[in-house]
């Protein structure tokens, strides 16, 4: 089977990237062919597999206009279509794609009728600030069920009105276009907590499975 793996960072930035690369190795060990779709960066790891890159978006230093691409990037839509035409995957496994890659890549994949599996490494599907904590560092679920203006009122995204507004607009776009409830075919969560919260927020429990991140036990012998 040919699997296209998607993640916005193609270097070891955090846990989701570790998962992304180790999943690729595990798939290859089981005889599958993999390719990667991510952002350009000098720190990117060369894997020896097919790799497709889009222009890097730095949300901390980029222009305000460029930041609007986090909602829908026409460029990344075209790049994904090109990658799909070239690699012809049987399935696309999406990891962290929100903001830098944008929901436009999901549209490109769905237009090809290719199944999409999404691993939700965080709770961004529910909380525009990703943390489920407000700007006062208090546990918060006020943005659930599409009430994203709460994020703007509290400046939950790094204390910034602009970043919180962009996060809220992104959340509204995803909800209106049913990215998580309809467009993505199956969702993997690393914990039961994430699964429960997604179900509470409207995602069907039939399309979610809690699957803890795997560990290579030989490294701990």
Language-model region placement:
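Short N-terminal targeting/anchoring amphipathic segment
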Residues: 82-101, 115-119, 124
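N-terminal subdomain of nucleotide-sugar transferases
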Residues: 1-43, 85-87, 105, 109-115, ...
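Carbohydrate-associated surface elements
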Residues: 193, 214
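Short aromatic-enriched loop/helix-cap "lid" or pocket-rim segments at secondary-structure transitions
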Residues: 17-18, 45-50, 105, 128-133, ...
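Membrane-proximal helix-turn-helix segments that form the acceptor-binding/catalytic region
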Residues: 111, 124, 136-186
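Short, hinge-like loop/turn segments at secondary-structure boundaries
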Residues: 51-56, 110-111, 134-138, 205
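A conserved catalytic-core segment of Leloir-type glycosyltransferases
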Residues: 29-91, 151-152
């Amino acid at each position: 089977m040919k699997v296209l793996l998607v993640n916005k960072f193609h270097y070891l930035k955090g846990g989701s990237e570790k998962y992304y690369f180790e999943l690729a190795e595990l798939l290859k060990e089981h005889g599958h062919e993999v390719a990667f779709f991510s952002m350009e960066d000098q720190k990117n790891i060369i894997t020896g597999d097919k790799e497709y890159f889009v222009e890097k978006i730095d949300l901390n230093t980029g222009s305000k206009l460029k930041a609007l691409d986090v909602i829908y990037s026409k460029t990344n839509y075209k790049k994904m279509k090109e990658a799909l035409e070239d690699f012809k995957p049987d399935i696309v496994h999406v990891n962290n794609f929100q903001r830098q890659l944008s929901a436009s890549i999901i549209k490109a994949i769905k237009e090809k009728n290719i199944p999409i599996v999404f691993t939700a490494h965080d709770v961004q599907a529910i909380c525009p600030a990703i943390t489920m904590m407000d700007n006062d560092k208090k546990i918060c679920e006020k943005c659930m069920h599409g009430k994203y203006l709460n994020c703007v009122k509290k400046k939950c995204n790094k204390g910034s009105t602009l970043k919180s507004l962009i996060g809220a607009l992104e959340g509204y776009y995803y909800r209106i276009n049913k990215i998580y409830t309809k467009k993505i075919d199956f969702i993997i969560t690393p914990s039961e907590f994430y699964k429960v919260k997604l179900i509470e927020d409207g995602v069907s429990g039939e399309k979610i499975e809690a699957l803890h991140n795997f560990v290579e036990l030989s490294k701990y012998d």
